[in-house]
């Protein structure tokens, strides 16, 4: 049931795992949720109707890419990102900070914000906490992120602490800039690298700001999975139980299962779409590389039990041919399959938490991956 206000309700718990709903005027997001990434206003190789039919309640838009092209002001003139891109449900936008730190050229960072040159044409821009919130407002997203500084791991402790403290000050400025917007939310972002005391400090400070939701950033950036999970075990018990928790940029199906077990409610990642464009399929049997010659004369589908036409109705031989030939349809079908599998996984997770058997579901799912793909013909 939609609401004129932003709200989150936990409907069931199984250990630290939570099943619930985020309510917004544009729709309800069932959690745990996976958000397909629509970097430049499109989920690559997919129609928006397909994305919705697969079970996605919310998608992600990228502030950095959209501010550069076509421009936030232009999107606003065209009715906002929902109207512009044809997605009627909720949209979450990131702040642009991660891309500024990783993609932009000649960046200069100080207390005020960050100046940088576009990776597209070299044009100079300035991003401040206030400007980030302004851009996200022009895009008219439903959930907005604070501007933060994300350090690459490994990072010296002194540098990690400096970035974390700066991100906290920027969170305060973003909160002021966001103000009171009924039906929308701004999330703070917990930083602190792989250092527990810094993560604790960040989580406690953001909790004191009484924001509508909380993200965990700066993970899944090359560190071992155990480090990511250790940081979640530090952060999640600190964050308010009545607010949603979003792990940014994560991840693999295994990452998702283990993060849900530690109390995370929301995820996004380019992995299913990017992998689909490179010939890799996610299935109940684990990852399947359609480039491999073993599929060249295999008449079987990826998964005969799947509800997704891409997974069920096309032979592996045909998918192999499309991938090897560089045909656009190959990327489209494998992206469709991958997003279908991710939403199938999330649906199973939600049902398992509601039924109190999340541990059994996790064991059965991981056993399926471990058994591997069906034998070659």
From Swiss-Prot:
Q: What is this protein called?
A: Queuine tRNA-ribosyltransferase
Q: What's the top EC group for this one?
A: transferase
HAMAP family associated with the record:
Q_tRNA_Tgt (MF_00168)
Task: State the function annotated in the UniProt record.
Answer: Catalyzes the base-exchange of a guanine (G) residue with the queuine precursor 7-aminomethyl-7-deazaguanine (PreQ1) at position 34 (anticodon wobble position) in tRNAs with GU(N) anticodons (tRNA-Asp, -Asn, -His and -Tyr). Catalysis occurs through a double-displacement mechanism. The nucleophile active site attacks the C1' of nucleotide 34 to detach the guanine base from the RNA, forming a covalent enzyme-RNA intermediate. The proton acceptor active site deprotonates the incoming PreQ1, allowing a nucleophilic attack on the C1' of the ribose to form the product.
GO cellular component labels: cytosol
Any GO BP: tRNA-guanine transglycosylation
Q: Region (RNA binding) spans which residues?
A: 249-255, 273-277
